[in-house]
């Protein structure tokens, strides 16, 4: 079973968000939440929320399909950050000049899945 959550237009730079996402990729979902809760990076909060949302989505899918659900079985199978639209702002400078400031945004995607049981042959 696979469940997905996407947060779009998050006001954090993709490079900083990728640093946090790389910490939790491949881990169990509960372990990832524990790491994100105490991570010092500001990007850990939106990633935490997306992981929580993916777990909730998995719970809803399991209830809908009538499958037994155990949160401890979920692993983060995919996690990636794409670049969102960039907001362009201007900072006034001396002698009538202006410097451009790029406020970058991110699209954070997390997919949680239950590990496939190997069939006995």
Swiss-Prot record:
InterPro entries: Ribosomal_uL22, Ribosomal_uL22_bac/chlpt-type, Ribosomal_uL22_bac/org-type, Ribosomal_uL22_CS, Ribosomal_uL22_sf. GO terms for cellular component: cytosolic large ribosomal subunit. GO terms for biological process: translation. Pfam families: Ribosomal_L22. The keyword Ribosomal protein applies. Keywords: Ribonucleoprotein, Ribosomal protein, RNA-binding, rRNA-binding. The keyword Ribosomal protein applies. GO terms for molecular function: rRNA binding; structural constituent of ribosome. Belongs to the universal ribosomal protein uL22 family. HAMAP family: Ribosomal_uL22_B. NCBIfam families: rplV_bact. Part of the 50S ribosomal subunit. This protein binds specifically to 23S rRNA; its binding is stimulated by other ribosomal proteins, e.g. L4, L17, and L20. It is important during the early stages of 50S assembly. It makes multiple contacts with different domains of the 23S rRNA in the assembled 50S subunit and ribosome. This is Large ribosomal subunit protein uL22. It comes from Pseudarthrobacter chlorophenolicus (strain ATCC 700700 / DSM 12829 / CIP 107037 / JCM 12360 / KCTC 9906 / NCIMB 13794 / A6).
């Amino acid at each position: 079973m696979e469940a997905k959550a996407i947060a779009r237009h998050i006001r954090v730079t993709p490079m900083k968000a990728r640093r946090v996402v790389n910490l939790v990729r491949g881990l169990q979902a509960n372990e990832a939440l524990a790491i994100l809760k105490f991570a010092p990076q500001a990007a850990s909060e939106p990633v935490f929320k997306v992981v929580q949302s993916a777990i909730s989505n998995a719970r809803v899918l399991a209830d809908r399909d009538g499958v037994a659900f155990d949160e401890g079985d979920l692993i983060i199978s995919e996690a990636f950050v794409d670049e969102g639209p960039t907001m362009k702002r201007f900072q006034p400078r001396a002698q009538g000049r202006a410097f451009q400031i790029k406020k970058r945004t991110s699209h954070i995607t997390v997919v949680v899945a239950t590990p496939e049981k190997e069939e006995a042959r």
